[in-house]
């Protein structure tokens, strides 16, 4: 078998990586929640009757409301709160670090929260920066939300802009 990467210099100590368990760890679930594995859910809260698809990661401190649907390959980071009756489509990404230091901060005190209201639908591969989105909003596929959304409507583009009020 061939090894990839550089060989360790003779006498160099073997490094052991920090291993974190994957799966479902310290999650608070509401009633009738469905989770399709594999997933990586930890220290988060999932509301009643919510569906979590495969290959989803929901990080500590995130809160998902009731009757939500989180589709496969979505990433929901720390400090995200999602209201009730929301739909998060495949590959949607939530970001809490604005890179104010020029690169990844890695410091939670520099991260910012994201809050979605009720009945918000996020399209496939949309990126949501730390913003607040009001109730009854549709975000189109591939959109990048960089500013707060305070008017119910359909938004799309990069940066996302209002196409039509609801």
For every predicted segment, state its role.
Residues 4-25, 35-133, 158-166:
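Flexible, glycine/small-residue-enriched loop-and-beta-strand segment within the central core
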Residues 28:
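Detector for the N-terminal beta1/A-loop initiation region of ABC nucleotide-binding domains
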Residues 62, 142, 148-150, 166:
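Short glycine-rich donor-binding/catalytic loop of glycosyltransferases
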Residues 132, 147-148:
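Active-site-adjacent segment of SDR/Rossmann-fold oxidoreductases
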Residues 136-145, 154:
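C-terminal/domain-terminus segments
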Residues 151, 156-159:
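Acidic, glycine-centered active-site loop in nucleotide-sugar glycosyltransferases
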């Amino acid at each position: 078998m061939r090894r990839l990467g550089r060989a360790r210099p003779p006498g160099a100590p073997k490094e052991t990586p920090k291993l974190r368990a994957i799966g479902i760890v310290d999650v608070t679930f509401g009633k009738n929640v469905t989770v399709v594995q594999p997933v990586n859910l930890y220290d988060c809260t999932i509301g009643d009757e919510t569906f979590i698809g495969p290959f989803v990661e929901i990080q500590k401190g995130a809160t998902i409301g009731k009757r939500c649907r989180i589709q496969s390959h979505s990433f929901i980071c720390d400090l995200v709160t999602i209201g009730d009756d929301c739909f998060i489509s495949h590959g949607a990404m939530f970001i809490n670090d604005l890179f104010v230091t020029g690169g990844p901060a890695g410091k939670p005190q520099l991260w910012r929260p994201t809050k979605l209201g009720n009945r918000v639908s996020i399209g496939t591969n949309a990126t949501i920066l730390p913003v607040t989105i009001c109730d009854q909003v549709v975000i189109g596929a591939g959109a990048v939300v960089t500013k707060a959304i305070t008017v119910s409507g359909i938004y799309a583009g990069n940066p996302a802009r209002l196409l039509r009020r609801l």
